[in-house]
Amino acid sequence: MSENTKQSPGTSCSVDQQRPVFYVIAILLPFVLLLILEGLLRISGFGKEYPLFVPSNYSQDYLQPNPEVVKRFFHQAKFAPPVGPDTFLFRKNKDPDSIRIVLMGGSTAAGFPYGRFGSPAGMLNQRIKAQFPDSHVEIISVAMASINSYALLDFVDEVIEIEPDAVLIYAGHNEYLGVMGVGSVYASNGSHAANLLFLKLKDWRIFQLIQSIYYALFQTPVDVDHSDGSRTVMASVAKEKAIAFDSALFTEGSAQFEQNLMAIQSALSIAKVPLYLSTIASNEMDLPPFSSSSNPDVEQLIDRAKPRSNRRIIQQGVTLLERGDTSADLAYAVAQAMLDESDERAADFFTLAKDYDLLRFRAPSSFN
């Protein structure tokens, strides 16, 4: 005859009390294992980080922008465009009486094509030194070609760490075709949220390991030829060469610009660092559209082989544009005709031609 065993009330109570501990351990164990793996990968030297600022080769007391920082956005450094910020040396430990301003932006902010002394940083340095001759002025530029607001957002925490008195942002022209832009060869395949997640994860060695496995098995990274010196970096990375005004890609690029700037402003506000956001300029009168849509009516009106009078181009061109035509070439032809006739509306139509330009090397007017 079998004998039934009964669990004492004390034993049952003890097991019930231990269950929450088991649940906590079960939940935390995967994260602990991931942290251990992360630590082992770092100890073994796997992967790499590219900080925004690195010690200067001239003195360990000074820092400078990292000339290789753009590589942080690429799984393999060899696929990064050959760009980097200029060398600006500044003290690792900020002097109490110094004025430190950081300039952030793309190629225009970096001074292209005139170089650092023709850049906003160079001109601002001279103006502030003239205004405050007895102060130690440090203008530090982290601007470079091919980057857009995603890179600026990724930089902002490191900029805050060097204790700037103010941050000046001049950006917008690279938003569509810059790294991670919606029209770039280096565009992410995901949404804005996926891009932000990538920025958070890219320095984790586990994430880099997963990238390595993925690219080895399923995908070959985009290889862009930067050897042609006659082309600018931005020309070599353009993928979507036709982003129509108010299209889905156009709206997506505009939204990412606004959201990223708001996130940057929020981070600087929390750190109590003043932000100066500049309006952006471009040559609208002397630079015709790079790419334009067209139709038979437009082609006939602006056909150079059959020149029309300025008055006719203005009258018929404005009518077509008011009916919804988005030809950049038409808007530019109307603007030129208005300029010849001293029509004050010319500036508006030069701006419209830029906004309708399909190849978005220039920021749309809505960015201002």
What are these regions (language model features)?
Residues 1-19:
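N-terminal Lys/Arg-rich, disordered targeting/topogenic segments
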Residues 25-40:
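Hydrophobic membrane-insertion alpha-helices, especially the h-region
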Residues 47-132:
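Membrane/wall-proximal cationic-aromatic binding patches
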Residues 98-100, 134-138, 162-167, 269-276:
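Loop/turn elements at helix/coil->beta-strand transitions in domains of secreted/extracellular proteins
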Residues 107-115, 141-142, 247-254:
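Second-shell loop/turn segments in exported
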Residues 118, 173-368:
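Serine-dependent acyl-ester chemistry module
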Residues 139, 145-156:
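Structural motif
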